[in-house]
Amino acid sequence: MASKTVLFNKHLESKAKMVDFHGWEMPINYGSQIEEHHAVRQDAGMFDVSHMTVVDVTGSDACAFLRKLLANDVAKLTVPGKALYGGMLDENAGIIDDLITYYLTDTHYRVVVNSATRDKDLAWINKQAAAFDVVVTERPELAMIAVQGPNAKAKAATVFSAEQNAAVEGMKPFFGVQSASLFIATTGYTGEAGYEIIVPETEAEALWQALLDAGVKPCGLGARDTLRLEAGMNLYGQDMDESINPLAANMGWTVAWEPSERDFIGRDALTAIKAAGTDKLVGLVMEEKGVLRHDMAVFFTDADGVEHQGVITSGSFSPTLGYSIAMARVPSGIGAIAEVEMRKKRVNVKVIAPSFVRNGKQAF
């Protein structure tokens, strides 16, 4: 039996088409994925992300534990509320999950992990926590609503209390603040400004309705996927998993190599991979007709005339750009042009850094 979020009935009220998403009954769209996508790029849309897993890490060793657990370094977080993104690696430097960590106090951090990886994440975190003076607490009583788009903050402001508006005023990206019952963070998965709001389940329906009344359009997983792909953001299980290291997933920037004495899990393996060289994740753009899709083969010829092959990890039509885009894992040495095999013929594609749209505009 699929799990339902606390907002399930609100989705049905808005005529959502529900699908099974890793054991959760979630809205794929509310009638038009394209309209929902454009709402986020041009105005404001919201997503039920209550299936995400919120974990609080507390205790005197909280910082030391997370410095061991994560490839990014939480010691960089010194201002309460500041967050960072990064990978949780196994000993072979494979990505167990990608996650966001918020620094609340020296003895309290909040970690948000993916829903599809919840069970293995919690098992891994608890196993590693045994050697530290920490308490790992899952927070299933919390729901989460993402409000995204150029007008998202203004529309959310009409719903927030005066105290909450004061708390978020001037807040930079990748920060979170607890104000009354809401934990409001300037994070997202769309390439637009906005908030991810962690709210007690008992208040989630009222918050969703208030945002609806403020003119925020409900958006499903379909639009969420095309938005995150345009923004060049990875989807766990598709663009990376435990067989992939962060350097091959465009996550090298999230690995904190300094200080060199910090012995995070997977460091030795990743050091060896870095020295040997690894595949990389690139963006592909195809301006002719057709749609680039997951698992299609990518071919290119290097400077020495040797042909290499890679694979598309995520691909879709881009509603913002009007043609197809993709992310692909390829051997290093790829140039500005490659070919993708479609319907038994090869089609030329442009190769770019994997970021296509930012703040509603073409990013390349």
From Swiss-Prot:
Catalysed reaction(s) here are: N(6)-[(R)-S(8)-aminomethyldihydrolipoyl]-L-lysyl-[protein] + (6S)-5,6,7,8-tetrahydrofolate = N(6)-[(R)-dihydrolipoyl]-L-lysyl-[protein] + (6R)-5,10-methylene-5,6,7,8-tetrahydrofolate + NH4(+)
Mind telling me which GO cellular component terms the entry cites? cytosol; glycine cleavage complex
Q: Which InterPro entries match?
A: GCS_T, GCS_T_bac, GCST_C, GCV_T_N, GcvT/YgfZ/DmdA, GcvT/YgfZ_C, TrmE/GcvT_dom1
Keyword line? Aminotransferase, Transferase
Might you name a Gene Ontology BP term for this protein? glycine decarboxylation via glycine cleavage system
One Pfam family recorded for the sequence: GCV_T_C
Keyword Transferase present in the record's keywords: the answer is yes
Q: Which residues form a coiled coil?
A: none
The main enzyme category here is: transferase
Q: What is its EC number?
A: 2.1.2.10
What one GO molecular function would you report for this record? Answer: aminomethyltransferase activity
Relate the protein's function as given in its record: The glycine cleavage system catalyzes the degradation of glycine.
Indicate the family of this protein. Belongs to the GcvT family.
Subunit structure of this entry?
Answer: The glycine cleavage system is composed of four proteins: P, T, L and H.
User: Matching PANTHER family, A to Z?
Assistant: AMINOMETHYLTRANSFERASE, AMINOMETHYLTRANSFERASE, MITOCHONDRIAL
Q: What is this protein called?
A: Aminomethyltransferase
Give the species this sequence originates from: Shewanella frigidimarina (strain NCIMB 400)
